[in-house]
Amino acid sequence: MKNRIPLNALRAFEASARYLNFTKAGLELHVSQAAVSQHVRTLEAILGVNLFKRLPRGLQLTEEGLHLLPMINEAFSIMGSALERFHEGKIREVITVAVVGTFAVGWLLPRLSGFTKSYPWIDIRVITHNNVINLAAEGIDAAIRFGHGFWQSTENYKLFSAPHTVLCPPNVAKKLTTPEDMKDYRLLRTYRKEEWSSWFKAANLKPWPVTGPIFDSSRHMDDAAKICGDIALAPYKMFIHEIENGSLVKPFDIEVHLGGYWLTILKSRSNIELNNALNIFKTWLLNASHSI
C-alpha cells in the first residue's frame, strides 16, 4: 500500500471499535465526535472498505472491521512495549541474575530498591537456585553462588566471606549452656557434609552423629529450626534481621569459614565488553558488598 495511513486514523478506529461509539471514543482521545468520525472515514477510504455499520443506536463492526481490529491491537501493543523500554531518554535494559536463595532473601533483595532508585532504566530479573546453575544453557547474565570461587567457566568476583555459626530459636538457646547441650536437639544440615564436622572441631568437641534432615537452602533450614525448635548451622550474615528481631539466636560465638558469596559471569562474556546494564550491576554489587 503506497498511501501512508495516519496514526490518528488507526487510533480513532481502535477506540471506536472498543466503545462502538464515536462520541465515547472522542472523549478518550480528547477530540470531537466529528473528528473521530472523519478519521475513521479517512481510514475506510484508504483501505477501500467499510469498517463500521452506522446504526441508529451506535456502531457495529463489519466483517472487515472485525478482521482488522486484532491486528491493530497487536500493532499498538508492540509499539507500547517498545516505548516502555525508554526511561527519561534512556533505553530500558533487562539483566537476569540467578541468585542462591539464602543470599537473595538475606542480602540482595533488601538492597535492590537502592539500585533501582539509582538506575531506574535497568530492570533486574532475579531467579533463585540452590547453588547449581548453568549460565550458558539457561540464558543467565550473571549468578551469585556460595563456595570458594573454583568455577572453571566463569570469571569469579568475591563479594564477602560467609562464616557459619549455630542458630536456633530463643526457647532452645535458653537451654544451651555449653555446646555439648546440643546433643539433646536435632541438628539440621545442608548438602555440604563437612559443615557440622568443621564446627565440632572448632568447638573442641568429639563429633556425634548428625541425623537431622538435609536441606538444599540455609534459608529453608533456618525456617525449619524456628518452627520445629531445632538447631541449624548457617551463614549468620544472611540472618541479621532474624537475629535482631530475636526470632533466631546465636548461642555461641564459635564460627567456621566454609566459603563465601561470589558474583560469577561467563568468561565468554567477560572477554568481550559487558553490556552497560551488566557492567553497572557488577560495579554496584561489588561496591555494596565490600562496604559491609
Curated annotation (Swiss-Prot):
Stored Gene3D superfamilies: Periplasmic binding protein-like II, Winged helix-like DNA-binding domain superfamily/Winged helix DNA-binding domain
HTH lysR-type domain residues are 5-62
Which Pfam families does the record cross-reference, listed alphabetically? HTH_1, LysR_substrate
Write the record's keywords in alphabetical order, separated by commas. Activator, DNA-binding, Transcription, Transcription regulation
Q: Which domain of life is it from?
A: Bacteria
Biological processes annotated in GO:
DNA-templated transcription
Give the DNA-binding residue ranges.
22-41
- InterPro entries assigned: LysR_subst-bd, Tscrpt_reg_HTH_LysR, WH-like_DNA-bd_sf, WH_DNA-bd_sf
Question: Could you tell me which PROSITE patterns the record lists for this protein?
Answer: HTH_LYSR (PS50931)
GO MF annotations, alphabetized: DNA-binding transcription factor activity; sequence-specific DNA binding
Under PANTHER family, the record lists: HTH-TYPE TRANSCRIPTIONAL ACTIVATOR AMPR, HTH-TYPE TRANSCRIPTIONAL REGULATOR
**Function, please?**
This protein is a positive regulator of gene expression of carbapenem-hydrolyzing beta-lactamase (smeA). Seems to also be a repressor of its own transcription.
The similarity comment for this entry is: Belongs to the LysR transcriptional regulatory family.
The molecule here is called: Carbapenem-hydrolyzing beta-lactamase transcriptional activator
- The organism's taxonomic lineage, starting at the top: Bacteria, Pseudomonadati, Pseudomonadota, Gammaproteobacteria, Enterobacterales
| Gene that this sequence comes from | smeR
